[in-house]
Each structure stands twice: as structure tokens, then as C-alpha cells.
Design a protein with these regions (language model features):
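Transmembrane helical cores of multi-pass ion-transport proteins
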Residues: 2-443
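The feature marks cytosolic C-terminal regulatory regions of anion transporters and related permeases
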Residues: 374-543, 561-566
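Short acidic-hydrophobic, aromatic-tinged amphipathic segments that line or gate anion-handling sites
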Residues: 544-559
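Short, contiguous clusters of charged residues that form electrostatic/catalytic patches at enzyme active sites
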Residues: 38, 199, 203, 476, ...
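Conserved SAM-binding loop
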Residues: 85, 524, 549
Length: 566
């Protein structure tokens, strides 16, 4: 009696169990203390970043905190990573700003809810492992483009420009640059000094190893506030926004079918970005702690986190690599640290949020300059441009330029389509059709340098060998298979064909029809599993005759010999 291996249902179901429930087994008091300390430190790091990223996204500063609190807690609680810290990230800044400018907060809530639903569906459909199929050139290109967009968007605040009199559009990157040039006469040197000092602190502070546990962004904010209080003239958050320290209520958007249709591309882009960035953060953190995350559960958690964030007035969220790394470095090893980070931010919101009104806008701009620099990957961009094939460079630069000039939705759509077309061309270039020449029985094999590669081909027999995938982009190459009048057998060797589509099958059918008109028999040699399945499903295997399928080239040549001599 044979042993039957049954599928591991328990293992399949376990991938949808939050990591929190796994790590609670054997959880110690010592680890709890480490998680609490790490969570508090990460919250201090996240505070200025959340405010800055919210402002860069065109929403109020408290909405960045809401996102880190609600989305951060849910994603840590349900997530597939032990140490993931989630919240607002720079990747969403440009797309969120565009949605808010065109559709208001209702549009942002609807887009974020749809993105959350898409992420949950992706998780349950086990798309966690498919995210890696997004080409590296696309992710590098749009990340660089986002960095440039963020940097350009902060120039006006860094220079203290007054753009209140400017009436032109300021949504696209080029529009923002135009606004800077039009309003350059309102330049405020004191704001530049505040921003310059903040930027210097952000660059220099991390070099002091003994002080690295104190976030440079927090020091920059404190110093800039002191400078303004001492008389430096620079606009603060309080000058531009009304800040609330109250907990938000549930936001129910005014929605209609037209809005849903218009925002669907944005929602899909948010979902893809959240999936890519969160899973990339998981991979990085896995390497730091020697663990393995659950990608599908992480996508479900990201979706749930974005749903909750939207309902409580937040913006899109995902795993933040820098904050996750800080969590690990400070001793965080379980999702408890991420949950403590969110609770700490909640306490800060209630107690200290009114003081955020004191933060100068040039300091926020300096923080975002550093965020843009760190995420830009400019060294990697240069390296890829120097070492990559021209087709990859084309995708890289196209995605980056489209992100800067237009928006992320257009960039990703064009980047994916362009990559697909270039991939098809590469596969088509790989596919080749070679013909064998007739080798008679009188060849001197001992003195022929090519004797190893030669086989005896019967008279009136044509032999062709196909290497590479048989698909629509390579279909024209099959026209090289020709039937000469007088031929009695045509062998097509398919050992090197891993796959076939219906377009290629149609070409093969046409070749078979030509063979029949010339009175020749078509023989297929060494047909692999997938092409054979396509032929059987389409009825071509019976059409050509099962006897005309041979296991290898020797059997095919012998079969052809019998046909010719018969």
C-alpha cells in the first residue's frame, strides 16, 4: 500500500495567524521591558516624521499622528512581522497631496478605504510572494522620483517664501518649481537660517555615536523652536494650521460611483506601494533579527490598518523601514513594541500636540529634505545607469521622469507596460528555429570535427529544432519552418521549448496544413509537458496523430526513415 502525502492544511492556515499570537508563547518579562523601551524611543522618532509627512501630503499635522496611532497599532497587532513599525511614509506624500487637492478629504478617505480592501484581497489570494515580481528598475525609479518631488515641494518653506499671492496650480512638481521662481522675491533669510541650522543638526547629530539614541529630528525641532522664540522670523505650523489634540471620531465620507471610478487607479497605486514597501521592510527586518515574516498576513494587516486609518481621519500607511530598523536596534523583538509606539503617540497627541504649533516650517522642510535624500537611492540610480542593459535604463529613467513630471499612477502604469513589452522582446529574441542538414550514410565520422553533433537524417526528411518559448511575440520565427516539395517527413524537435501559447499553436497548425498539402508527415520530437498539454486540450495531438509524437530525436529519425522507406 502506497503512502499518500496529504497537504498540510495546518501550515496553510498558520500563514494567516498574526505573528503576535506566535511570539506570545514563552514571552518573558525581560522582553516586555525591552519592547516597551523600544516602542517609546520609536514613538519619539516617529513624532516629527509623522507631522512632517502629513504636511508634505497636504493634510493637517495631527492626521500624520492619527495614522501612526491607528494604522500602526492595527498593523502591529495583526501583522505578519515580529518588528514592523507602520505609519505615514514618504512614498505616499505625492499621491496623497494630489488626491486631496483634486478630491478633498472625502476623496482621500475613499481612496484609502479602497486601497485597504485591495490589500486584504491580495493577502487572502496569497499575493504576498508575487509582489517581488515588480521590477527593481520600477521601484528604484519611482522612489527616486518621489524623493525629488518631496524635495522640490519643501523649497518654498525652507526659503521662507510667501506664496499666498500666487494663483497658479501647485499640484505637480513643475508647478511647484514655477511657484518658487515666481515668489523668489519674498525670500526670508531668517527662515533660511532656521532651516539651515535644522538641516545641519540632522546631518551632524547621527555622527555622534553616544547620542544616536536621541533622534536628530527631535533635536532639530527643539533647536528651531528656541531660535524662533528668541526672535528669528519664520512661519510655524500654528501660523498655517489649526491643531487639535482631541481624539478623532469616525469619518464617514460622501461617496458616489463617479468618485469611486475616478479614484480606483489611485487606490490601486496606494495598495501596490503599501504592499511593496511593507514587505521590503519585513525582508530587511528579517535579516536583522533572523526571523521569517508571513507576507500574506502582512498584506491583510496593511489593508486592515489602512481601513482603520481612513475611518479615523488618517492617511495611507505602510511599514516604515527606518522606524522598523530603529525598533530592532533598540531591543524591540515582538509586535508589542509597535503597539507601545502607537499608545505612546496617543498620549503625546492628547498631552503635547498643542505645542506642535510652535514648530517652524523651515525645520519641517529640513526633516523632509533628509527623508528625500535617504530614500532617493541616488547612488543606486547612478550604478544602475552605468551597469544595466539599455532596456532596464530606459524603464528606470522613464519611471523616474514620469513620477516627477506627472504622478505616481502614470509612472507605475507606463513602467509596468514598458517592462512587459521589453520582456516579451527579450523572450522573442531568445527563441530560435534551426534547420538540420541532410547527412548521408557515407560520411567519414572519424575525420569530421563536427561528428558529435551530427546525426543521420534520412533522405526526403527535413529536421527543424526550436529553442525557447513558443509564444505570440516569436510566432513569426516559425515561418522559417518550410516544407520543400518532395519531402516525405518534417521533424520538429521541441526539446528546448518550455512553454507554448495558442498563437504559437496556430502557427504549428499552419505548418501541419502545409505538410499535408505537400504529402509530408509532420513529426514532433521531445514535446515537454506544458506544450503537450496545450496541444491535447486543443485537439492538435489527435489531429497530427499520436504515432507522430516521439520521445526523442533518435526515435523521430527512425520513424521518419520508416515513413520514407515505407
Amino acid at each position: 500500500m502506497r503512502n499518500v502525502v496529504k497537504p498540510l492544511k495546518g501550515k496553510t492556515m498558520n500563514q494567516f495567524v498574526p505573528k503576535l499570537f506566535d511570539v506570545m508563547k514563552g514571552y518573558s518579562k525581560k522582553q516586555f521591558v525591552n519592547d516597551v523601551i523600544a516602542g517609546i524611543i520609536v514613538a519619539i522618532i516617529a513624532l516629527p516624521l509623522s507631522i512632517a509627512l502629513a504636511l508634505a501630503s497636504g493634510v493637517g499635522p495631527e492626521q500624520g499622528i492619527y495614522t501612526a496611532i491607528f494604522a500602526g497599532f492595527v498593523i502591529s497587532f495583526l501583522g505578519g512581522s515580529r518588528v514592523q513599525i507602520a505609519g505615514p511614509t514618504a512614498a505616499f506624500a505625492t499621491i496623497v497631496a494630489g488626491i486631496v487637492a483634486q478630491n478633498g478629504m472625502d476623496g482621500l478617505i475613499v481612496a484609502t478605504i479602497m486601497a485597504g480592501i485591495i490589500l486584504i484581497i491580495m493577502g487572502f489570494l496569497k499575493f504576498g510572494n508575487l509582489i517581488r515580481f515588480i521590477p527593481y528598475t520600477i521601484t528604484t525609479g519611482f522612489t527616486f522620483g518621489i524623493a525629488v518631488t518631496i524635495l522640490v515641494g519643501q523649497i518654498k518653506d525652507f526659503l521662507g517664501l510667501d506664496t499666498s499671492a500666487y494663483t497658479g496650480p501647485t499640484i505637480e512638481t513643475l508647478d511647484k518649481l514655477n511657484a518658487v521662481f515666481k515668489c523668489i522675491n519674498t525670500f526670508n533669510w531668517q527662515a533660511l537660517v532656521v532651516g539651515g541650522v535644522s538641516l545641519a543638526i540632522l546631518i551632524i547629530w547621527p555622527r555622534f555615536k553616544k547620542l544616536e539614541k536621541i533622534p536628530a529630528s527631535l533635536i532639530a525641532v527643539i533647536v528651531s523652536v528656541i531660535m524662533v522664540k528668541l526672535g528669528m522670523q519664520a512661519k510655524t505650523i500654528g501660523d498655517l494650521y489649526t491643531i487639535s489634540s482631541k481624539l478623532p471620531g469616525i469619518s464617514i465620507p460622501h461617496v458616489n460611483i463617479t468618485m469611486v471610478k475616478n479614484l480606483l487607479p489611485d487606490a490601486f497605486t496606494i495598495a501596490v506601494l503599501a504592499g511593496i514597501e511593507s514587505l521590503l521592510s519585513c525582508v530587511v527586518s528579517d535579516g536583522m533579527i533572523g526571523s521569517r515574516h508571513k507576507p500574506n498576513m502582512e498584506l491583510v494587516a496593511q489593508g486592515a490598518g489602512n481601513l482603520v486609518s481612513a475611518l479615523f481621519g488618517g492617511i495611507p500607511a505602510t511599514g516604515a523601514i527606518a522606524r522598523t530598523a530603529a525598533n530592532v536596534k533598540n531591543g524591540g523583538r515582538t509586535p508589542i513594541a509597535g503597539m507601545v509606539h502607537s499608545v505612546t503617540l496617543l498620549l503625546i497627541l492628547v498631552v503635547l500636540m498643542p505645542y506642535a504649533a510652535w514648530i517652524p516650517m523651515p525645520a519641517i522642510a529640513a526633516i523632509l529634505f533628509m527623508v528625500a535624500y535617504n530614500m532617493s537611492g541616488w547612488r543606486e540610480m547612478i550604478s544602475l545607469c552605468k551597469t544595466s542593459p539599455k532596456s532596464d535604463i530606459l524603464v528606470l529613467l522613464t519611471t523616474a521622469v514620469l513620477t516627477i513630471v506627472f504622478d505616481l499612477v502614470v509612472a507605475i502604469e507606463v513602467g509596468v507596460v514598458l517592462t512587459a513589452l521589453l520582456f516579451l522582446k527579450r523572450m522573442a529574441d531568445v527563441t530560435e528555429v534551426k534547420s538540420w542538414k541532410y547527412i548521408g550514410d557515407n560520411i567519414d565520422e572519424n575525420n569530421d570535427p563536427d561528428r558529435i553533433n551530427l546525426k543521420h537524417v534520412p533522405k526526403d526528411t527535413l529536421v527543424y529544432e526550436i529553442n525557447g518559448p513558443m509564444f505570440f511575440a516569436a510566432a513569426d520565427k516559425f515561418l522559417d519552418i518550410q516544407t520543400v516539395s518532395g519531402s516525405k517527413a518534417v521533424i520538429v524537435r521541441m526539446r528546448g521549448v518550455p512553454s507554448m501559447d495558442v498563437t504559437a499553436l496556430r502557427s504549428l497548425r499552419n505548418i501541419h496544413a502545409v505538410c499535408k498539402r505537400h504529402g509530408a508527415v509532420m513529426i514532433l520530437s521531445h514535446v515537454n509537458e506544458q506544450p503537450m498539454s496545450v496541444m491535447e486540450h486543443a485537439g492538435f495531438a489527435d489531429e497530427i496523430g499520436r504515432d507522430n509524437f516521439c520521445a526523442n530525436i533518435d526515435a523521430a529519425l527512425e520513424h521518419a526513415k520508416n515513413i520514407v522507406e515505407g
